[in-house]
Amino acid sequence: MKNINPTQTAAWQALQKHFDEMKDVTIADLFAKDGDRFSKFSVTFDDQMLVDYSKNRITEETLAKLQDLAKECDLAGAIKSMFSGEKINRTENRAVLHVALRNRSNTPILVDGKDVMPEVNAVLEKMKTFSEAIISGEWKGYTGKAITDVVNIGIGGSDLGPYMVTEALRPYKNHLNMHFVSNVDGTHIAEVLKKVNPETTLFLVASKTFTTQETMTNAHSARDWFLKAAGDEKHVAKHFAALSTNAKAVGEFGIDTANMFEFWDWVGGRYSLWSAIGLSIVLSIGFDNFVELLSGAHAMDKHFSTTPAEKNLPVLLALIGIWYNNFFGAETEAILPYDQYMHRFAAYFQQGNMESNGKYVDRNGNVVDYQTGPIIWGEPGTNGQHAFYQLIHQGTKMVPCDFIAPAITHNPLSDHHQKLLSNFFAQTEALAFGKSREVVEQEYRDQGKDPATLDYVVPFKVFEGNRPTNSILLREITPFSLGALIALYEHKIFTQGVILNIFTFDQWGVELGKQLANRILPELKDDKEISSHDSSTNGLINRYKAWRG
């Protein structure tokens, strides 16, 4: 990968001039000038997904200049580098190959001259065999009963992805009850343990090193709880499995290393649901559906790696995001799924984007003088409409939004879905076109009221519009289409990282807090007054000690 400061490129300078021409152009004007705008600014993927980006403050010239930026930053070369197993995560000297985990074509992918696909396939086969034994009831707990509940213990990528996917694909789930524990706050695991029976519960401990503080604290608490009922430590092996590479620590915990599912250092945590970390997904929806999830992602991988940039969905969404983030000064993006099963999707890509591209140092080691990753947030519709859409519609901040919805619902109750989708369509129309003062006044006249007598309230009912959105309409949320959607966002994030000249696949920003917490933890063991920190931290620790009793 080349290290190119995007702001020093000719394309960036051209975009800056173009922005001066575009900053006062409205979405309404763009639609008024071109009746064919939708067909020019939308792409259908695999007859499963329609991405409409027409309600953006862009023209064909805008996209052409953004494509020039991608070319000048050698995006095509970076894509090739990632897919070929080059060690593009240079700060950790690692390849980045989540695409290998879902490489259903099984073509060789080399890391250090070795094809990784045989090992990938071997772990998948092991996951298949194990999951089928659990789901069928062939696997018995220590009292001879079948497993009814699965508790995934992990944090970050070992929790967010599996939890998001198992929730999104609940219509495909089997009889097993899924639970997820991540927070080191004892409340999290305590509440889950109240719901399960030690005789019929399987715990998955997801930690590559088997040393992650939060995960191992929860795992040991689960083990202690289990042994209070089971007594003999030999029974641990029937109720615990590990998603890890540390065979020694796994064995010492009491887990049979035959039930340790490995992954590799070229799998980043926030891209790991496709790996053994996805075992909870397999247990929830079955192996065949998990393969469909992989297949959907693989289809998007092929689209991303082979489609010209002009019709390449991850590239288009990435470039539009850069347009708002780096030229309009938008600081956030909202992800708004109109599907209750997708209620963790925004949270998943909050990590996916902010941990990937929340960097202030470029690939040359220099502090950047431009914006990098945006703040990502969102909630399902229509809940968000009654919470924060007020600011999106009438606030002073530009918030570009992705609206996501399925055409077909898994729960066709009465006219619920039509009402949901009517809101989905209405919101992007309202954000784009708004409501003028003239329309507000005419509405008053139609009600037999004189707008002049209501002049004090009219300004508050005006919507400026010109708020940008993308609409992603899925035929239906299936394992395949969800896999494709996740991969779409993954590759969007990668594309932005390439152009912004940052390392997307490390996360050094999570380390300092952990180091300081490890230093503070021994200081909390006694009641001595602390004076080794700044006055604020000392004061907080000392008040905690006084109040805890």
From Swiss-Prot:
Disulfide bonds: none
A Gene Ontology term for the protein's cellular component: cytosol
Reaction(s) catalysed by this chain's protein: alpha-D-glucose 6-phosphate = beta-D-fructose 6-phosphate
GO molecular function, one term: carbohydrate derivative binding
Modified residues (N6-acetyllysine): K80, K228, K234
Catalytic residue positions: E355 (proton donor), H386, K514
EC number: 5.3.1.9
GO biological process, one term: glucose 6-phosphate metabolic process
Pathway info: Carbohydrate biosynthesis; gluconeogenesis; Carbohydrate degradation; glycolysis; D-glyceraldehyde 3-phosphate and glycerone phosphate from D-glucose: step 2/4
Record's keyword annotation contains tRNA-binding: no
Function: Catalyzes the reversible isomerization of glucose-6-phosphate to fructose-6-phosphate.
Protein name as catalogued: Glucose-6-phosphate isomerase
